Regions:
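Tubulin/FtsZ superfamily GTPase core signature
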Residues: 1-151
Length: 151
């Protein structure tokens, strides 16, 4: 994948949901012990992080549905904490870019409502923290991820 989901978590959720069928996730489920804990860090105002966090969490809590995974009960009942990063930087305006600074707050607000109903509201996490900063400072180049974000 050259770029993320450029502010479209609905697309990201379809793609990232395939992770539950991967060998890596099955290996993780098999290696998970009863005393293990999980801590997930994600962003909330774009597409990839906003989609990835709920999907990963859902797949962990639905671990009994993973075939050939021995420790899926431990995984399903694991204590999970998370840190979600709110908008914290400024980007240059570029009308041709799919990423627009003016959309950050609206996308964050929509994601927060979704998280309230589908993550904290149903006790999928034991603790959820938010961190962010005033993002009005110097503007970074507007890059959807295939060039500048890899520096």
């Amino acid at each position: 994948m050259d770029i993320g989901f450029v502010g479209n978590p609905n697309i990201g959720s379809v793609v990232l949901n395939q992770f539950k069928d991967s060998q890596e996730f099955q290996d993780f489920a098999n290696a998970f012990n009863e005393q293990d804990r999980i801590f997930i860090i994600s962003s909330i105002f774009g597409g990839t992080g906003a989609a990835g966090f709920p999907i990963i969490l859902k797949n962990i809590r639905n671990a009994p549905n993973i075939q050939n995974a021995n420790a899926r009960g431990f995984l399903q009942n694991a204590k999970i904490g998370a840190l979600t990063v709110l908008p914290y930087f400024n980007i240059q305006a570029d009308e041709k870019s799919p990423i627009q600074r003016s959309h950050f707050i609206a996308k964050t607000r929509a994601a927060l409502y979704y998280y309230k109903d589908n993550i904290t509201g149903n006790n999928f996490v034991n603790a959820l923290y938010y961190i962010g900063d005033d993002y009005i400072g110097e503007a970074y180049p507007n890059d959807p991820g295939n060039r500048g974000q890899k520096k």
